[in-house]
Structures are given as C-alpha cells and as structure tokens.
C-alpha cells in the first residue's frame, strides 16, 4: 500500500473477511483507476473461459477459485453485487449433480449464498427437499445458528437433533456444537431471570420514593416545573399556565405516575354551583378537584356528602375556572359505558384510470410549450400497478436475489402453497376491479391492451392480430429449431459413425496384433513343450541306462503289464556267470544293457531300441577288432565275445565247423548254443563235446538261454515260484483292507532308498499279459500271446479292488488276470533276488559237498520259517514307493501301494497320475464300454485341434465313425477348452441308424484329451456303480452318464450326456441382470448342492474342482410337480437341481489309506483357490494337508457367487486373534435381499471354510455329517417359514429367464 493515509481513507469501505485479505488487492483498491477496472474485467473473462472450457471430473474447483478471487478483488460494498450473482450461478449449475450433493465445498457455497439473502430459512428448506448436504453436519449447524439469531431456540435445538439422528459427518463436531448451544441457552435464561429481578427491585424502589413524597394529608408535594406558575399559598389549586403542557425538563417516572393519578382523580363527578350557598356568610363554595386541587381523598369525601371540608375557595378573590374556559370544558366519564356512533366509510378501491390525450394535457397546463409538455408528461403520476412494476424494475440484481433467492430455481412441492398464494396475489394486482353497492364487479385486464414500449392502448382486433403474429413467429421458430436439431443430429451421427469406424479399425488392428502375439506365444509354447519332451526323453533314456547298468530295479514289483516285463529284463542287464569269457577275453567281452542286440521282441519299444542300436554300433566296431585278434590265434576254445553272441541268430548251425578256419571272418564262426556255454563255463569240457551238444539241441535265442539257465541250474540267481498259501488266504485277504496291511507292513520294516520305475506315455498295451495254461502250474513271463477274444466283465467282487486281483492271480474266463496267473488257478507268484554269487573257481569235489550241505541247512531253515508264517495266516505287503529291508521273505506278496509312509500324497503330479492309471487299468479294461485302440491314431482331423471355443462347424463337415461299434457322429460345435488339462469338449450328433430308431437323445458331448487318459472314465463309472450299490438312485441321476471311451495312442475320446446347452449356474446368475436371487431360491440351490456333494463323499470320491461353470442346470419335468417340502424328493423334484461335471481332477480315496492327506502346489489346484486357505491347510502345524475340505471350499465359492450376483470372487484373510479364515469382501452382499445373512449364510460359509475334513478312520462319515448338518439348517428354516418356501413359483420364473437368455446367446 502506498501510504497510511490512503488506507485510513478507504478502510471504512472494505468488507472484512474471516480468512483475511490479500494486501496487493487492497493496494489496488486504494488506487482505483480505469486501468484497474479493465484488469479486473480481463481476469473475470479468464475465469469464465476456464469454466466454460473445462472438461475434467471436478468442475467445482474452478468455481471456488473464481469465488475467492471475487471476494479478494472487490473489497468494497460492490462485492455483494458481484458475489451473489456468481453464487446463484454456481448453485444452480450443480443442483442436479449427485456427486456434489454431499460435498462440503458445494454446501459452503450454498450457506454463503443463504447468508447474503434476507430470508435464509427459505434457502435451508430448499436444501432439505433437494437433499443437499443431507449427511453433512455443516447444514444443520448453520440452520441452527440462523434460528438462534432470530430467537427461535426451539427450532435451533430441533435442527441440531435432526443432524445427530441422521448421523451427519463429522458427528463429533455437531455434538460439540449442540452442547455449546445448550450452555448458551442456559446462560441466557439465567440472565433473563436476573434482569427481571432487577426490574422488580427498581419498581419497588420507585414505589417507595413515591410514597415518601406524599404529605401528611396524602397529597403529593407540588414541584415547580420549568416555566410554570407558582400557586399561592392561600389557594390550593393545580392550575398552571398553558406553557406547562409540554414535557418538563428532567421528567421522571414519578411525574408520569402523578399525572396518571391526577387523571384518575379528574374522573369524579362535577358539582354544580349553588347560589344560595355561595351567598352565605362564610362565602365558601365546594368545587371539583379539577379546579381546586383537592386530593382524591377529599374529593371522595365531598362526593359522599360528608361535612368535612378539606379545600375552600373564596370567589371574591379568584375567578372560577368554569367561567374562564367554559366552552372548552368537557366532563370526563368512563368510555366503556359510552357507545360512539361512527359514520359509514366507503370502501376505497383503486379507481379506473382514465386515458388522457397529450392535447388535453397540454391545454390544462398554463403557458406550456412543446418541450414543457414533454417534461410534464414524464411527471404524470402512474397507476398503482405501474408503480409496482416500475419499482421492481428499478431494483438492482442484488435486491432482487436477496428478496427472492429461489426465483431462478425449480419449484419444489413444499412451496406449492406459497407459490399458489403469490400467483393469486399477482392475478389480483394485475386486474383492476370496480365494486359497487350492489356487489357488481367489472373486470378489465389493462396490460393486455397496452404495449410494452408505448403508453397508449390498442383495440381488440389489434390484440388478436398480435397474437396471430406471435403464433406464426413461434411456428417458424419451431420449424427452424427442428431443422437445426436435425442438422445437429446428422452431424452427431456422422461424427459417431466416423468414431465407430476408427474404433473398429483400431480394434481390428489390436485383434490382429493380439492374434499374432497369441500365435507367437503358442509357437513358443509348442517349442518349449517339444524341448521339454525331448529333455524328458533324454533324461528318461539316461536314467534307464544308469538303472540298467548300475542299479538293477527292485525284484519286488508285481508283474502284470509289459512295463513289468521290461523291468524284469533289466535285472539281467549284467552278464551271467557262464557268459564271462576266460581271462584272455574277459576284459573285452563284458555285456551291458546298452549293448543288448535288437531282437524281434513285441514288448520292446521302438524308440528305446533305436537309441540302443545307435549306441551299439560304435561299441561293436571296437569289439570286432578284438574278435579278429582272437580268431587269428586259431584257438580251439569257443570265444564268447559280444559280437559273436549278438550274431548268433544270423548264423546257420550247418555252416562252419568247430575249430575250422574262418579266414579272419568272424561271421563264419560256428553257432554258439546254450549248451556250449554251459559245458565250457561249468564243466570245462573240450570243443568236441560242445559240438555234440550243438547237434543234439536246436539253436536258442538270447532270451532263451537265460530261461535255460534258470531251469537247468541248481542255484540260480533269480527264481520264480508259486506260493500255495495265496490260494488259502485269498478269502481272508478280501475282508482286510489293502491299505491297512500295507501300513502294518511298513511299520515293521526298516526303510531303505528305492528308486521308482521310469514313466511311459502309454500305460495300456495292445494286449494283456496272459498266463500259460498247463497242468503242472509252471509258466514263463517272457511270452505275450495275442488276445483277440471279446473281453468279459469281471464279477462285482473282483472289480472292487483291481490291485488285489492282479496280486492274487484272479483271472477272467479268457485267462486274463493280474500279473499273468496260470489258467489252472494255482496262485500268484513272487520275484525275489538272492545274494550275488561269487565267481566260479575250478571244480573241486570237497567244495561242492560243502556247498550242498549249506544249501540243505538253508532249505531246512526256510521250511521252518514258512510253517510259522502259515500259522499266522497273514500276508505282509510291501509298498513299492516305500523302502525295503535287506532281508525279504521269499513268500511275501509285494504290491504297489500309492500311499507313502508319511501319509501325504500329491495326487496331481504327472508321475503319480501315471501310477494311478496303471493301478486302475485292469478295472477299466473290464468295462464293456471301454475300447482299447492303443495301436492306432485317433481318427480326428487337424481342424479340431485348431478350433476355438464356441466355434460352429458346417453341416456334415466333420463325420467320424468309432471302431468296435456302429456309432457315427457329426461334430457341430466346439463348446469349451479346459485350462487345467488342455482337453476340448465338442457338441456332436449321432447320425447312425441305431440312434434314429431308438428314443435316446441323439445329442452327445465328446471330450478329447491329449495326452490320453482313462482316469475320468474310471471315476464316472465308479460313481454310478457305488451309488447304485447304496441304492442312491436319485443322486445317481445328478451325475452325467459316460457312454464310451476310445483309447488311442495320441488321444482319448469320451462320449457322455450333453447338458451344456441347458446352461450353467453362472448363466443362471447372469440371467438376473445384477438383481440378487430370491433368498428361498438360493437356499434351495444350496440344499441341492450339499446333498449332491454329501452322496459323492459317501462313496469316497473328492471332486476337486467345484465351480459355477461345472454345475449344469436341469430344467426337469413339469408334470407331477408338487409343492416343495423339506426332506422329500417326489415327482418332478427328482429331475430338478444341477448336474456336476468334469471329474478330471477327482480323487478316489479308496485307493489310499483312510488317514491319507493330500498336498499340491497352487498352480495345480482349481482356479481361484485363495492362498490363505492353502497356507492354513498345507503349511500349518495342525493341518499337514487337505482332504474333503477342498470340496468345501468349492461349495463356499459357488454360494458366494450366488450371493454377490457374480460381482467378485471369494477373498479370505487369516484372523490373528482366532487363527481362523474370515471373508474380507462380505460387505458387498446386499442385506436387504438376504435377511438371514448374519444368522445363516455367514456362519455356514465360515464353518465350511475352517473345517479340515479329518477325524481318523471316521473321515467319510464325519464329512457327510457336517454337510448334512448344514443342509438341515436351511431345510428347517424354510419349513418354519411357509411364506418363504414357495420355491416352485420362483423356480418357474428362473427357468423362463434362463431359457430366454440361453436362446439369445444361441
């Protein structure tokens, strides 16, 4: 600011602000010039431009800056004119914006606007109706302050209480303000009481003073007033001069009271003068107190006629007052007893204004000119109506807004009465009426016949013409507006089309880029998969070579597949004792598994033989050099090098002679037979005797010489024998659980490390391993006879435990059994291995006798042990995945148990799934609807591998006929593709003749799995079989029927019921369009789901992937459909509910021990599994794994999906206080739709989420009991509330909505 004097001169015109003012703005205000005004206008225009061009999400921010700028830039009185208009614009602009109705910034603008108006209460009532600031404490606080300032403390208190009841925020501030208001109210009441007491005390003091001023006779002492006359001492008169009529100086309340008392005394009657009395000797006359100044008491005595005279007057000395002012004197009397007649007054109304011409006005004015006439016309008084209009026009905007702040706002319902009253007053003022005594009323609407800019009236015809012109103008304007609107709409449409085209182009580009990226990613994934497969194959070959060369596989595996045969062959990987050469050739003729020649064996794999042949080529070249050197020496002894043994099958026994010259060619050497090897190594006979055996015996193959050694030698390395105790203990083994025996055996044995067998891609060969029928019960494991006969189904008791059948040698009618049992039914067998034999020394009779004695002693000990074991009548089982001891009983039956010693299983690993399929392969092969086509490729076109979900195929474009059956199908649509195992599901139609003649549904679902798998087919058949055994026919219909499975080398194809077109539970939820499902209907779906999972757990199956997409809706029948009752399933209710599909991740708990637990990484678990649930069920100290509670989690996810209309997935957190799982996002469930949320739904979800599913051996019964208990809670609630149990009508409505939504999707 320039100087202090400038500030002193202008500070009185500055309006103070609570926030203070900017000194720079004040400096500009001190020096107001034209430039400063122009700068203010420029800044104002900038703000207007910013507000108009703003396109952000918070436009009120610019208005707040604009308002603050006006308050700072206009510090004088003109701020109100600028500010109130700006506030009105801002409040009117955001009136219909919902997000600002409870914004404190917008509410402060309204309060500032109300503060500048003359009646803020009207503004607050408007805010109440519009619900602006409804939940903000500032509204109630400001309204209470207004009422308090007006003295309406009751309304102020109500305003505070109303805000507290509505829980306006911040509630603490509002409560504190209410307490402050109560304190002020109490203080104000105390102050008023004190003030009243002071007034009473002052009044009492005044009364005492007045009494003190009375004399002894009761008269007040006369006090001299200013400019008054002094009465004589002889005359007691109150007459004063006329100057005393004005108020005397120093007038007090005592003088007023005395004056009032005197007036009351003057009301006494007037005594008439009596001449007789006046002529008496005393010459005294009693007069009225008004003239003689007697007191009230004396006047009363005189009126009563008492003889006592207090005041006297001598007429000779003073003229009486009556004679002096006789005409102006009026007797005083009581006005209440007098009726005054008044004249009738005419009702004055606004007269009819007569129109006056200018000529007549000019004639009336004297000495008027034309200019004077014009000036006089302006001074003509206007009518009352025009005065009102004129006065309203002269009002400024500030006054107009202050008087009517809501004039430009929409009217609300609360102001209807006021608006109606105002309109009626306007009508009355706009029309001038003239009334007569006869109550006649003549109306005349003068503004209709007067133009706005002119003062003369118009005729009726002119008025009609003006109305017609207005209508024409309005029509033209409307037409012009329509044309403009059409143009604008066309422009908008064109712009939208251009935008849509651009968006389409961008989307197409993005889709192309996405497709290219997806193709690249697929290619990269395929390359990685190929690399991974190649890497696995290499590792597999390396492991196989290492195991075969160094660590022969355990001889404790049960032989019932081709894989077992290869494992047994691996036992003979090292050269036999008699195959070792003499000292001269022993170093160069060692035989290993990698050098085994490629013999025509049907059990060997082509891929494995190719690798071994390639490896043998280099070794054979090296061995040939050694063989040539040995042959050049012309030694008569037979050379058992590797090359000679490898080429034995290609040598003709008739060619060549023993010890003949071969001319350095090793291929011309004589045929080496099994007999030559035995005689040379064991009995050290010469070459002639070996040649005799060559002539007597046929040539043998490499495998046959091993068999010959096993049969002919007394002390073999490996022995295969039959156990006669198995046949007697077969019945006993059926009654005892297989897993319990394995567990009891594992506890007795000491663990040692044992490696597992390598995996193979195909677990089913083209034919099984069949036993050789014979009378003596002997057999060989090296034969594989083709089985072309039809498979016969096994008996029910044999299907229950396929592993036991394979071990105990139970065979079907064709001799197909577990592990190659003989057709005579002589029992199972065991492979065991003795200790490695020492190297052979030269033959000695003493040593031979010692060996025979030792063998006899060993046989006696073994017989005693066998007798003791027969008395126990139990068979010990050994787990192939577990560990074995160094000493194994040769009569022990060793089986493949899939439960480790610690009882924790990872069921989703590839290795474990391969063992599972091996385990159930015998059961699957016995099913009639299973077709093993393992030697062929799947007859599916490549087009199916490249299709996408929901892709339709042309009619009859893909037709496939399945082998071993007359079924022919037509592929019509690709339904879905699984993200878990990569399987694809298609919709197919049967077009064969059998489907046309039968009444069965021709539509089926075809599931293609790559790599092939039999697990889902096994689970589906086991569910139906076990439910049928338990007579659960109703639940049996809730699971899909699997018609057949075709097992190829590259894929497995499964045909089953088609339920996808009926819709899933996800489709049911989405058909409601975001509206929550009716609570009774949600309870019905929950009851059906719990019942279905309860029966599934009862038969020992864990589904493992319960979700909304795997629950397919059943429309069911409509005939014989009674009302729903709890615990009953009659009529059409049997076909209602859902069908559970996708058993690829299911677990058969009967295969494992009863106390087995399961663990798996989160990548292999179902999608959406919460990490907190996995932590508490796998990594905690109490729960080392999960079991049936995996399905509990699926049930909770499905029901949460229903309760939230599919908006969010289930989110969990671990409570630190209770250590239990809690639902984080339960607040999104609408309590209005689900009234039993706190009493039923949330306890139900938390109970299942925190249940671990284990209770020792009673696990299955415990899980079913928990599900049944929760199901009974919902059934009891619906049964106790019959109004809410009208499920039938609700289900009909849901069926219609789902049918319409599914039809629209198709």
From Swiss-Prot:
UniProt region (Disordered), positions on chain: 229-262, 363-439, 528-558, 579-670, 747-875
**Compositionally biased residues, Acidic residues:** 860-869
**Molecular function (Gene Ontology), one example:** protein kinase activity
User: Keywords in UniProt for this one?
Assistant: Coiled coil
Give every BUB1 N-terminal domain span: 47-211
Q: Where is the Protein kinase domain?
A: 953-1298
Q: Which InterPro entries match?
A: Bub1/Mad3, Kinase-like_dom_sf, Mad3/Bub1_I
One GO BP annotation here? mitotic spindle assembly checkpoint signaling
Taxonomy, superkingdom? Eukaryota
What cellular component GO annotations does this protein have?
kinetochore; nucleus; protein-containing complex
Coiled-coil intervals: 187-218, 467-544, 843-881
Q: Where is the composition biased (Gly residues)?
A: 815-828
Q: Where is the composition biased (Basic and acidic residues)?
A: 837-859
Q: Does the keyword Repeat apply?
A: no
Biased composition, class Polar residues, residue ranges = 392-406, 603-613, 747-759
SMART domains registered for this protein in UniProt: Mad3_BUB1_I (SM00777)
Q: Where is the composition biased (Low complexity)?
A: 363-379, 411-437, 531-548, 583-602, 614-635, 762-773, 793-806
* Tagged with keyword NADP: no
Similarity comment text for this entry: Belongs to the protein kinase superfamily. Ser/Thr protein kinase family. BUB1 subfamily.
State what protein this is by name: Probable inactive serine/threonine-protein kinase bub1
Tell me what organism the protein belongs to: Dictyostelium discoideum
Q: What is the lineage of its organism?
A: Eukaryota, Amoebozoa, Evosea, Eumycetozoa, Dictyostelia
Gene from which this protein is expressed: bub1
């Amino acid at each position: 600011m320039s100087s202090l004097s400038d500030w002193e001169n202008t500070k009185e015109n500055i309006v103070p602000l609570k926030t203070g003012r900017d000194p720079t703005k004040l400096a500009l205000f001190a020096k107001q010039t034209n430039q400063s005004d122009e700068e203010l206008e420029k800044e104002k225009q900038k703000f207007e431009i910013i507000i108009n061009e703003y396109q952000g999400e918070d436009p009120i921010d610019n208005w707040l800056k604009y308002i603050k700028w006006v308050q700072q830039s206009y510090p004088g009185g003109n701020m109100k004119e600028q500010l109130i208009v700006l506030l009105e614009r801002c409040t009117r602009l955001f009136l219909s914006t919902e997000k600002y109705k409870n914004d404190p910034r917008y509410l402060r603008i309204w309060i500032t606007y109300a503060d500048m108006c003359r009646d803020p209460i009207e503004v607050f009532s408007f805010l109440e109706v519009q619900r602006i600031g409804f939940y903000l404490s500032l509204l109630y606080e400001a309204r209470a302050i207004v009422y308090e300032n007006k003295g309406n403390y009751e309304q102020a208190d109500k305003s505070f209480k109303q805000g507290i009841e509505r829980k306006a925020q911040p509630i603490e501030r509002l409560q504190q303000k209410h307490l402050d208001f109560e304190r002020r109210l109490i203080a104000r009441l105390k102050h008023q009481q004190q003030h009243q007491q002071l007034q009473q005390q002052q009044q009492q003091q005044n009364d005492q003073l007045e009494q003190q001023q009375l004399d002894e006779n009761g008269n007040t002492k006369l006090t001299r007033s200013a400019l008054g006359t002094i009465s004589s001492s002889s005359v007691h008169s109150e007459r004063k001069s006329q100057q005393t009529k004005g108020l005397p100086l120093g007038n007090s309340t005592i003088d007023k009271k005395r004056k009032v008392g005197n007036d009351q005394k003057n009301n006494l009657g007037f005594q008439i003068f009596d001449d007789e009395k006046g002529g008496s000797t005393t010459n005294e006359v009693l007069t009225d107190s008004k003239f003689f100044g007697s007191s009230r008491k004396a006047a009363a005595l005189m009126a009563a006629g008492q003889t006592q005279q207090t005041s006297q007057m001598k007429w000779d000395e003073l003229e009486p007052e009556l004679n002096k002012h006789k005409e102006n004197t009026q007797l005083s009397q009581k006005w209440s007893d007098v009726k005054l007649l008044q004249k009738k007054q005419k009702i004055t109304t606004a007269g009819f204004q007569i129109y006056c011409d200018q000529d007549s006005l000019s004639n009336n004015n004297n000495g008027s000119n034309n200019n004077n006439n014009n000036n006089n016309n302006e001074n003509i008084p206007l009518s009352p109506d025009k005065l009102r209009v004129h006065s309203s026009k002269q009002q400024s905007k500030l006054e107009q807004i202050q008087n009517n702040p809501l004039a430009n706002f929409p009217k609300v319902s609360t102001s209807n009465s006021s608006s109606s009253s105002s309109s009626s007053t306007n009508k009355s003022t706009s029309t001038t009426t003239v009334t007569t005594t006869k109550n006649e009323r003549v109306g005349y609407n003068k503004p209709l016949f007067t133009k706005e800019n002119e003062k003369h009236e118009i005729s009726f015809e002119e008025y009609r013409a003006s109305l017609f012109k207005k209508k024409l103008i309005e029509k033209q304007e409307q037409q012009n507006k329509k044309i403009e609107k059409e143009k604008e709409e066309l422009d908008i449409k064109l712009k939208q089309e251009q935008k849509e085209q651009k968006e389409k182009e961008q989307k197409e580009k993005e889709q192309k880029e996405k497709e290219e990226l997806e193709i690249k990613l697929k290619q990269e994934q395929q390359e990685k998969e190929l690399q991974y497969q190649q890497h696995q194959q290499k590792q597999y070959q390396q492991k196989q070579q290492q195991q075969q060369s160094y660590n022969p596989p355990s001889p404790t595996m049960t032989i019932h597949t081709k894989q077992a045969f290869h494992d047994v062959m691996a036992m003979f990987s090292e050269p036999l004792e008699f195959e070792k050469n003499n000292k001269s050739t022993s170093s160069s003729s060692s035989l290993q598994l990698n050098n085994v020649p490629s013999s025509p064996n049907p059990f060997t794999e082509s891929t494995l033989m190719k690798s071994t042949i390639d490896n043998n080529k280099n070794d054979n070249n090296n061995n040939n050099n050694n063989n040539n050197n040995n042959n050049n020496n012309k030694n008569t002894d037979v050379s058992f090098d590797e090359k000679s043994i490898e080429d034995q099958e290609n040598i003709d026994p008739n060619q060549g002679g023993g010890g003949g010259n071969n001319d350095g060619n090793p291929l011309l050497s004589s045929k080496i037979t099994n007999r030559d090897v035995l005689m040379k190594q064991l009995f050290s006979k010469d070459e002639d005797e070996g040649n005799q055996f060559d002539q007597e015996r046929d040539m043998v193959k490499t495998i046959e010489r091993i068999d010959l050694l096993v049969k002919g030698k007394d002390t073999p390395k490996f022995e295969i024998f039959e156990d006669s105790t198995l046949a007697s203990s077969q019945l006993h083994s059926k009654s005892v659980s297989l897993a319990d025996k394995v567990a009891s055996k594992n506890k007795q044995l000491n663990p040692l490390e044992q490696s597992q067998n390598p995996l193979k891609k195909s677990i089913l060969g083209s034919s099984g391993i069949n036993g050789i029928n014979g009378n003596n019960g002997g057999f060989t494991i090296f034969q594989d006879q083709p089985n072309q006969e039809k498979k016969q189904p096994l008996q029910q008791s044999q299907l229950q435990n396929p592993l036991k059948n394979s071990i105990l040698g139970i065979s079907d009618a064709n001799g197909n059994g577990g592990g190659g049992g003989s057709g005579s039914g002589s029992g199972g067998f065991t492979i065991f291995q003795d200790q490695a034999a020492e190297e052979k020394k030269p033959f000695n009779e003493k040593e031979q006798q010692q060996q025979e004695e030792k063998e006899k002693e060993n046989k006696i000990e073994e017989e005693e042990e066998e007798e003791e074991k027969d008395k126990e009548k139990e068979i010990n089982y050994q787990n192939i995945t577990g560990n074995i001891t160094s000493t194994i009983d040769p009569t022990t039956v060793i089986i493949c148990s899939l439960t480790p010693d610690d009882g924790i299983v990872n069921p989703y690993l590839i290795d474990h799934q391969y063992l599972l399929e091996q385990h159930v392969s015998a059961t699957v092969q016995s099913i009639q609807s299973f077709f093993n086509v393992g030697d062929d490729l799947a007859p599916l076109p490549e087009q199916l591998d490249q299709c996408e979900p929901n892709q339709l195929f042309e009619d009859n474009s893909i037709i496939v006929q399945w082998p071993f059956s007359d079924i022919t199908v037509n592929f019509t649509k690709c339904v879905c593709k699984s993200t878990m195992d990569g399987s694809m599901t298609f919709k197919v139609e049967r077009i064969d003749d059998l489907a046309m003649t039968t009444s069965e549904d021709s539509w089926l679902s075809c599931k293609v799995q790559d790599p092939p798998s039999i697990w889902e087919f096994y689970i589906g058949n086991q569910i139906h079989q076990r439910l049928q055994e338990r007579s659960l026919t109703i639940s049996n219909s809730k699971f899909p029927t699997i018609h057949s499975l075709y097992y190829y080398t590259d894929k497995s194809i499964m045909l089953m019921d088609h339920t996808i077109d009926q819709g899933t539970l996800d489709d049911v939820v989405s058909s409601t369009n975001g509206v929550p499902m009716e609570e009774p209907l949600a309870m019905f779906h929950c009851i059906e789901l719990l019942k279905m999972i309860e029966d599934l757990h009862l038969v020992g199956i864990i589904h493992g992937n319960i979700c909304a997409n795997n629950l397919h809706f059943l429309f069911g029948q409509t005939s014989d459909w009674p009302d729903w009752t709890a615990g009953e399933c009659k009529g059409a209710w049997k076909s209602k509910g859902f069908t559970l599909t996708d058993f690829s991740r299911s677990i058969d708990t009967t295969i494992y021990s009863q106390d087995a637990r399961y663990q798996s990484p989160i990548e292999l678990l179902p999608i959406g599994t919460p990490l907190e649930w996995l932590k508490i069920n796998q990594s905690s100290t109490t729960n080392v794994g999960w079991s049936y509670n995996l399905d509990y989690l699926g049930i909770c996810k499905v029901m949460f999906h229903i309760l939230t209309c599919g908006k969010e997935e289930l989110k969990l957190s671990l409570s630190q206080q209770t250590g239990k799982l809690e639902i984080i996002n339960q607040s999104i469930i609408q309590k209005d739709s689900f009234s039993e949320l706190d009493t039923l739904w949330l306890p139900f979800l938390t109970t299942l989420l925190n249940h671990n599913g284990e209770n020792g051996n009673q696990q299955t019964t415990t899980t079913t009991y928990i599900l049944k208990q929760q199901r009974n809670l919902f059934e009891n609630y619906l049964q106790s509330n019959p109004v809410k149990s009208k499920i039938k009508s609700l289900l009909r409505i849901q069926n219609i909505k789902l049918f319409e939504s599914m039809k629209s999707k198709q």
